[in-house]
Amino acid sequence: NPAATGRTPQLNIVGAIQTHAAGYEDAGSSMIAEADIALQLGKTRHGVGASFMNDEFGLFSHKRFSLMYAFHFKLFGGNMSIGASADMLNESVNGSKADLGDANDPAFPTTDLSGSKFDASAGIWFAHKKWYAGLAAQHLTAPTVLLGETNEMKVERTYNFICGYNITPKRSFFTLAPSAILRYDGTEFRADVTARLIYENERKRLYGGVTYSPQHSVTGFVGGTFHGVDRSY
């Protein structure tokens, strides 16, 4: 969500790698790297950032480079932000590795093809004392990327909603932080529900939890903040 750009006053750098169906050949992986920072210009607060994503699955590869901006302001006792991003998409297919029963089938390329297209995303974000929520739309232009002279790939608009709440009992070092992410691309719907338990005491911060996505996966994770760097597995 580009509206979340600059939501913290510190420079924020994020990197993550996820493998798909470990142990399977050409199962693919996803990687994202992102950096953003908040800027105070007079009495107004802004956020700027950049991100790069690479998603590979089988013969296909999807890359996106984004420049993000968000405008922040106070609203209803919380912090509201509106953001947008300019995106460059690159879609590619490794046709030279395709194992086809009919090598002359014109529906499948037999060489490596790639194509690029400009795109855009936008979103809103609201954070209160104990809860937050955001709504975003990706691929606003719903671009059709040309792959060579005879092939093309349609990129559908994607909508996502995120929300979360922090529950901290009085005089406790522990916080229970449930959250959810909902995604819809006009055809498929996916929900990821997470329960995270956080321990914070002075400069120590440790956490662990589980994420459940119906019909997709169950993921466990642990992590902590060490010398200002958040690491998780």
Question: Model segments located where?
Answer:
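Subset of outer-membrane beta-barrel
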Residues: 1-233
